Every structure is written in C-alpha cells, then in structure tokens.
Amino acid sequence: MITGTMHSRAHRGWIGAALLAAALTPWSAQAQGHGQTQTQSQAQAQTPMQTPSLALELAKSGLRLLDGQGRVQAELPMRAKRWDHRQLPDGRTVALVQDADSGVLRLIEARQGHLEERRRWDGPAFNVEALCLYLPPAQPLLQAFVLGDDGIGEQWLVDERSPSGAGHAPMMRRLSSVPDARGCAVVDTENRLYVAEAGVGLWAQSADAERHERHLVAPGLAPADLPLWLAARGSGRADALPVVQPSGQTVPVRGSGDAADDPAIWVHPRTPTASRILGTDKKLGLAVYDLQGRETQFLPVGRVNNVDLRQGLRYGGARWDLAVASQRDRKTVVVFQISANGQLTTAAELPTGLDDVYGICSGRNPAGGLDIFVNDKDGRVQQIRLQRDGKTWTGQPVAQFRLDTQPEGCVVDEVGQQLFIGEEKRGLWRLALEADGRMGAAQLVLPVGDVLTADVEGMAVHRSAKGAWLVVSAQGSDSFVVLAAQPPFAVKGRFRVGLNAALGIDAVSETDGLDVTAANLGGVYGEGLLVVQDGHKRWPLGRQNFKLVPWAEVMRVMP
C-alpha cells in the first residue's frame, strides 16, 4: 500500500484538495479521490495518519518513494508544484506530477522500490493553478483535471492505454471552472470534482466528462478547511452501473448543436458486413453510414426527427425494404425505398393530420405490409397503414390513441404482436396489436423511477434463439435498461456506454434514439449490433454522432 505526502515552504495557507487519503486514512481504494498541491500545512496534516508500508513524498529535490520508517527507497529529481496520485485496480500506484520548469506533466509509477516514468505530456496553454486525478469506479481509466486562472480548465485522459499524439494527452472536455481556483479534489466514489475558489467557497461539479452541472456546496469555506469539510461529510458512492465499450462510431452529423437523434439498422441480404446505419440529422436530413462509420449517402429532406425501417415487405407480389421518418416541418411521414445495395431514394411523403410530428416506429402488419406509428408532442399516437396503388405509396389511417404527456421513442415487436412506446416523463407503455392490426389498451410496463429515469427515449427489441430483450434509453442517467420483451417484462439489468481508450472513442451521454439487430454482421457483431445516439461528442470535441456497441458486450455485463 502506498500513500502520498508533501513537504514545502513555498505555498502556505492552503491545504491542498487532496488529503482524504493522506490526512484522514491510509491510502486505499476506498479513500481514493484527492488532488495535491505543495504546501507546508499539508505536511503537518499527516500526523494522525497510520504508518503505511510505502509512501510517496514530493520534496524540494523531487518525488521520493519512502518505506515505512521514512527512509528514501527511490528518488526522481525534479522541481514540481502540482501533483496527485492514485492506486490502480491492479495494485500499482501512479503519480501525475507537473514539472515546475517545463510545465510538462509526467506520469510516474512506483514499482518494486523504484520510480519509473511511464508517460509524459506537454502542459496546457494556460498556467495551471490546480491539478487532480480521477479514477472512475465503473470504468477505471485514469483522468486528470488541470485548472487554470480565469475559469479555464480541461479534463484529460492520462491512462497508459490512451493514445497520444504530438506530446499531447487526449482532451476529454474543456471546463468552465471557477475564476480563482486554489485547488481541486475528486472523490472517485461519487464521481464528483470539488474546486476551492478563494474568497467564495467550495464548488462541486460532476467529474464525468459527459455531465455538466456545477453548484456551490460550502459558501465561505476557506481552502485550508477543505480536508476537514470532506471528512465531516463522509463519502457517498455514485450509482456505478456496468460499462460496455463502443467498438465504432460514425462521423459527426452535418448539423450543429443538438442535431443527431435516431438510428435504424439495415441488414444487407447477402453481405452482412456491408449493412448500413441510417441516422437522422434533425436539422438537415437523413444520413446513411457503413459499419465503419463512414457516411455513404445523405438525403437533404429537412428536419426529420426519428427513423425506422422494415425489410422484405410484401406489396404487389414484390418484396420491398422501406424506411420511414417523421418530418417535423411539414408534419408528414417521409417514405424511403432501400435498394439491394443499401441506397435510399425518397418514395413518398404522407400527411398525418398531427400538429407537431415527433417520434415514429413501424412494423409488419398481418398482410405483410407496413404499419406506421407516428406520435405528436401532445400525446397523440396515430397508426397509418402504408398502401401501394400502382407506383404510388399512400397512407390510410387505421387507429389513434393518446397518452397524457409527450411520447417519442417506440418499437413494434412483430413476433410478440405488441407495440412499446415511451412517455418521456412517465414510463414505458405496451399495447397489444390485434389480429386486424389495430392496437389494444395501453399497459404501463415500467414507470419512471430509480431504474428507468426520465426522459424515456429510444427503444428497440433484440430477438434471437436465446430470448427477446427490450433495450430502452434512460436519458436522465445516461444509462440503458434491458428488460424481457414478454410478460412479466422483468428487468434484466442496466448499463452505460463508456469510452474506448484504445480506439479513441468517447463515452455516450444523453442518448435520444437507438436501434438493435440480432443479425450476425460479422466480427465483433456476431451476436448483433446496438447503435445509440451520443448527445455529447467529447473526444475530440465536435458535433454529435452515433456509437456502435457489440450486443455480446451488453449481454456480458448483464447479471
């Protein structure tokens, strides 16, 4: 076990944000979460601590590794001002130290009585006033917060497995921090970053790069009192859901801001690896991507919100692959024909009679044609039967019902003869599809609560010989719920989509739409593919996109 100390007369009056481990308890996985800065008062705060077997010490001459009797086992000469350290899940201890002369950040490992530099990165363009590390419990990839003056800050991925180019660590996000930061601390178990602002107090914000909130938790708290405040309040534990890694991502959508929304997967009938992903850009149109995430086609059909498709539909003795999208400007449903090689053409535009067209899904009806379920923000859900007269596609209204508040995501489970639809603030509903294709009464399957957090967004059914699972996006907690697609609709588990450091893919947050297929698309997608919209493109910072997740990974983390 290794703990950290520091000795210096250079910077008095502030107890660095990271003495949870040093001043309160011996260093352990349970006490991780504290940024460190050179101060004399920090060294004095070491007195109540139990003697560990090894300790890291930042002295004037450099970083030292001490044994239990305080004898120097190893020393790495340097002048340093900011540092922090963590014990990794494999038992190793690493420290991130900023060289006071060059500004370079050095990742140092304490190993077998030695100190060894593992990685180094150029410092940021601004002057660093506070530095602290973060090791997320659910996906322990080492990250660093570097905070400067005037409210400037950045969050970096400094894990050994992360790619780095031209001497720079991958930046996960820019931070709007406090204007006069005097130190920072991260309580890993809470996924919470604390920043001390001189003359104001202590601010707290999410350490998760995908979240944004910040609030003042201790007005007037002096920076020197931060360790005592943290000790008095105790340490909570965030909801640590299992994490799956994305294996791919699409290029960013063309529209800026909140533009990407809903995907749909088209499976190539002969070459599954040549399958396509349709994705709505709700500002400009519909994009088509291959499984490598490259855009193969773009249809400038305006503000289409959601999209769905079905393959092998029967009309006039022929088979058709068709996609439908909700068009908000014209309050219509746009119908697309899909060719055998995955090319889309606009085939028709159907009126709905709705005032604010929003979500859409579709399913094969008993005659082998397509039924479309399109909803309005006022709660109305309309069922339209797609018909073909000669070479013309038309829509025939079949039924309509209404939820109390705004719906959006929905999915038709043809095998189960049922429609699932999400009411954003209330929960997940199920309606039986009758033999004549009409809808039965609505049944609340899973209300909004601790498991399914609002807003309820995208949903899709993965059906294979192993069973049928409904996966639903719970936008408020950046999570996904998996439940059985048949009564009693038992919840199997929840998960989040984290980052993939090796491939340079950021994590997923605030998901709108999703789709899933059980088809074998080859490679890691042998058991199917889950595609989810990512509400915040962090790494690198850019426009929204869609992430690809092997379904086998989802099942791997289910209980």
Regions from the PLM with identified roles:
Residues 29-559:
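Sequence/structural signature of beta-propeller domains
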Residues 2-16:
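Bacterial N-terminal signal peptides that target proteins for export
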Residues 5-7, 20, 55, 222:
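Intrinsically disordered, low-complexity regions enriched in Ser/Pro/Gly/Gln/His and often acidic
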Residues 16-26:
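Bacterial N-terminal signal peptides
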